[in-house]
Amino acid sequence: DLVPEEPPARLHGDLWNGNVLWGHDGRVWLVDPAAHGGHRETDLAMLALFGLPHLARVTAAYAEASPLADGWQDRVGLHQLHPLLVHACLFGGGYAARAAEAAAPYA
């Protein structure tokens, strides 16, 4: 199996750094959701894909609240594959090559 079996979680669905707003008061706001049920590693992979600042703090807090399965970091590329393919279709550029790199371990 590619990912550990667990019940679907409520996902933001479009959780990239542009949809994470950092308030002056230290609070964080998540905007523009495309909410759906899915594997909870997916939102974390999206944050990593587009370089969220303080990602290590975010993933540590997430894991503290709800521990992630062993090896979740190894599956980040798998969860990034779909958005990379979408971006390759929409924007071209290097997204197709990045999608191929993400898919290579699973070919």
Where is each model-derived feature located?
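Hydrophobic alpha-helical segments that form the core
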Residues: 77-85
